[in-house]
């Protein structure tokens, strides 16, 4: 089951902005892309019921996010955890979940 750890980035997306050293970035493009993808998913169900959609969406977003962050930090887990707003142990657990350790 999904580890319901508080995630600073999720909170920042919820309030509609991400603070950086150079200013504020509004993640509207990301939000719009997720909305289109989820809408597309439901349109392809052809009347069938979906289950565990929340878990599926989180996994589909979380895995590439972790991959990109780890590339950006050149594998530095401490830096990656700080960027994500989670502790390093939680990051390790998530990396293991997706086979990225």
From Swiss-Prot:
One of its GO terms (molecular function) is sequence-specific DNA binding. InterPro entries: Fis_DNA-bd, Homeodomain-like_sf, HTH_Fis, Trans_regulatory_Fis. Pfam families: HTH_8. Keywords: Activator, DNA-binding, Transcription, Transcription regulation. It comes from the Bacteria. Transmembrane segments: none annotated. Residues 77-96 bind DNA. Activates ribosomal RNA transcription. Plays a direct role in upstream activation of rRNA promoters. Homodimer. Belongs to the transcriptional regulatory Fis family. This is DNA-binding protein Fis. It comes from Shewanella frigidimarina (strain NCIMB 400). The gene is fis.
């Amino acid at each position: 089951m999904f580890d319901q750890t508080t995630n600073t980035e999720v909170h920042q997306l919820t309030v509609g902005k991400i603070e950086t050293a150079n200013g504020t970035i509004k993640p509207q493009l990301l939000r719009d892309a997720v909305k289109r993808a989820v809408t597309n998913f439901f349109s392809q169900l052809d009347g069938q019921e979906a289950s565990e959609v929340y878990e599926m969406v989180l996994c589909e977003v979380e895995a590439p996010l972790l991959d990109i962050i780890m590339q950006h930090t050149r594998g530095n887990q401490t830096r990656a955890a700080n960027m994500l707003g989670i502790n390093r142990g939680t990051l390790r657990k998530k990396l293991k979940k997706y086979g990225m350790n």
